[in-house]
Amino acid sequence: MAKQIQAIRGMNDILPTQSPLWQKLETVLRETVSAYGYSEIRTPIVESTDLFKRSIGEVTDIVEKEMYTFDDRNGDSLTLRPEGTASTVRAGNEHGLLYNQEQRLWYMGPMFRHERPQKGRYRQFNQFGVEVYGIGSADVDAEVLMLSHRLWEKLGITEHVTLELNTLGDPAERAAYRDALIAYLEQFKEQLDEESQRRMYTNPLRVLDTKNPDVQALLTDAPELMEYLGEETRAHFSHLCELLDAVGIKYVINPRLVRGLDYYNRTVFEWVTSSLGAQGTVLAGGRYDGLVEQLGGKNTPAVGFAMGLERIVLMLETLELTKDIPATVDVYVTAMGDASKIEAIKIAQSLRSELPHLRVMSHCGGGNFKKQMKRADKSGAQVALVIGEDELANNQVAVKYLREKKEQELVARDALATYIAELI
């Protein structure tokens, strides 16, 4: 027997028993962004490696350790996209979507990072994100947060997530803070772990994001970025908080919150949860006003967020919020005898035409009544339609209830669509 080929570690199949939950989640996402007037953009999975080096930052973990990068047959360095924002900016610049325009965009698709697989975090993962271009005011920062909050409401998990906010200031403010933070960290250089020592000069704000409790203890008296912010940045952040208060969205200001990507400025945020064990991030984003210009476009304000769908699916399963996911089949059509089978196929096709939203599965492969009913029950259908010799002769269909304790009913063939429409 030939050796079975397995899926690559950290890259998972979504099986038929799992896909209804994914479809429900994706429907909620699409309906919500549509309600806010956002348009979908789809970009290639493979991009030039330089795109991510220039956007994410060459000294970030993603670029240094996690990207799937390879040379193609022409010797060009290509990378499987590790996140969606850079590709969206590249597409916007390339197709003239951004300069002197306002764009509200959303995307959804697979991303790739070579990191250690763990529950809810994989090497291929599905990401959903929104990006807004051309608006620099705090009201649009509030809008993307309101949109994310609406997602939690529709998914039923509002009480299980907390919004954390911070502001990183503009580049000049951050540079002044960077110098102060380096000066503070240098006092403890020998006590820092190897990763923090490396980050201290290349990306010192990321030291604030350390998971090492010993390093966290050293940061207790570290200077805070808020102390280095100018009046304009403070006003922007204050107005954002005012807007969130006005619509009743609760938040926590976390002065240690930084983002793992270099392009963020001013507003940054994360929605976090403790429902998956240790506190984890389920959605993150912020403002990145310099990225469009950094990637060859004109100076364009921008803000957005991204979320990994695997973590949301895991959260819905953990909180047992998957019980109302409907089966993939509404009606299962069976037949007893060759002549009846032809009629059953015609009935199934007719129902699909008359009731386009009805999910109809026809029994294929023959078998006795017991076998067909077993398949019908396994399909998850609400009812089975039985067409035997008697039903065929009388131009009727037997409707057998699979989920309710009700007597089987005989329905005239020409009244079947109306009967099923009222039933399901």
Swiss-Prot record:
Complexes and interactors: Homodimer.
EC number: 6.1.1.21
Organism lineage: Bacteria, Pseudomonadati, Pseudomonadota, Gammaproteobacteria, Alteromonadales
Entry-linked CDD domains: HisRS-like_core, HisRS_anticodon
Protein's cellular compartments: Cytoplasm
Family per record: Belongs to the class-II aminoacyl-tRNA synthetase family.
InterPro entries the record matches: aa-tRNA-synth_II, aa-tRNA-synth_II/BPL/LPL, Anticodon-bd, Anticodon-bd_dom_sf, His-tRNA-ligase, HisRS-like_core, HisRS/HisZ, HisRS_anticodon
Pfam families in the cross-refs: HGTP_anticodon, tRNA-synt_His
GO cellular component, one term: cytoplasm
UniProt entry tagged with the keyword Aminoacyl-tRNA synthetase: yes
Reactions accelerated catalytically: tRNA(His) + L-histidine + ATP = L-histidyl-tRNA(His) + AMP + diphosphate + H(+)
Keyword annotations from UniProtKB, A to Z: Aminoacyl-tRNA synthetase, ATP-binding, Cytoplasm, Ligase, Nucleotide-binding, Protein biosynthesis
HAMAP family, alphabetized: His_tRNA_synth (MF_00127)
Protein name: Histidine--tRNA ligase
Subcellular location, principal: cytoplasm
GO terms for biological process, alphabetical: histidyl-tRNA aminoacylation
